[in-house]
């Protein structure tokens, strides 16, 4: 029993179950030169068969092309409150295609359960009448075949990551290790040593870095070897995938 995990670039991942359910996580595909983010491995048009689009928070580099993909597919949008309001007001997406998430909530979509966990970050968006600041999320994905994947979004380090490991026992963690450009520096929420520590707290078998622009992916692999040598680091280039099996 396997889950196919494909990295599309920046924060974007495509997961496919054995039954063929395709989901996208934080689908930033078009890139953003202003933030130093290159285009991803695919265009939004490649995902007309997607069934689930998960967004952790409403930052542009995480929402990406989520709304566009929902419009050209039968996918439902699973997201925080701020992203929901943007989807309704900016993109005109029907409310019955949006599953609003807050921490603790769990929805079942066929052969995958999606549970929202609190991330240490923010989910801020300007609106016509002012602004909205909602709860940012991480996600725990539990598959019918037994695999469990933790997707961190933009979380910074916090002690509940250890609790998540004890309670939910994920097998794979996908963690940010870099950030967007701010005056020539990176707005990094989870630094390399913190990401390696988080992987250890989560108790995963495999850790995958994301959300970086320079050599942080390789540096994370080195940090993981030093701090959590029992965890396999998996460095994926945009477009690459691997199959995880229990």
In which residue ranges do the predicted regions lie?
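Active-site HxH/HxHxD metal-binding segment of metal-dependent hydrolases
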Residues: 41-109, 113-123
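Short active-site oxyanion
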Residues: 3-4, 52, 71-77, 147-149, ...
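Zn-dependent metallo-beta-lactamase
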Residues: 1-22, 28-32, 37-38, 117, ...
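Short gly/ser/thr-rich secondary-structure transition/capping motifs
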Residues: 4-7, 32-39, 96-100, 153-155, ...
């Amino acid at each position: 029993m396997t889950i196919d995990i494909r990295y599309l670039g920046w924060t974007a991942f495509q997961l496919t179950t054995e039954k063929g359910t395709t989901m996208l996580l934080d689908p930033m595909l078009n890139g953003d030169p202003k933030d130093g983010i290159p285009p991803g491995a695919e265009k939004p048009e490649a995902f007309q068969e997607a069934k689930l689009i998960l967004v952790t928070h409403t930052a542009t580099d995480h929402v990406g092309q989520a709304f566009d993909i929902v419009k050209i597919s039968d996918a439902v949008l699973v997201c925080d409150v701020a992203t929901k309001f943007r989807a309704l007001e900016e993109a005109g997406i029907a409310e019955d295609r949006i599953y609003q998430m807050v921490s603790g909530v769990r929805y079942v979509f066929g052969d995958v359960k999606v549970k929202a966990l609190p991330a240490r970050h923010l989910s801020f968006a300007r609106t016509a009448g002012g602004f909205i600041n909602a709860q940012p999320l991480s996600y725990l994905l539990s598959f019918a075949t037994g695999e469990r994947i933790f997707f961190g979004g933009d979380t910074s380090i916090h002690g509940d990551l250890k609790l998540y490991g004890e309670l939910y026992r994920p097998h794979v963690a996908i963690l940010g290790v870099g950030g967007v450009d701010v005056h020539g520096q990176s707005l990094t929420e989870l630094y390399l040593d913190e990401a390696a520590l988080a992987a250890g707290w989560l108790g995963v078998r495999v850790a995958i870095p994301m959300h970086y622009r320079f050599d942080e992916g390789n540096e994370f692999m080195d940090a993981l070897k030093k701090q959590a040598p029992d965890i396999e680091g998996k460095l994926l280039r945009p477009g690459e995938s691997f199959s995880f099996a229990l």
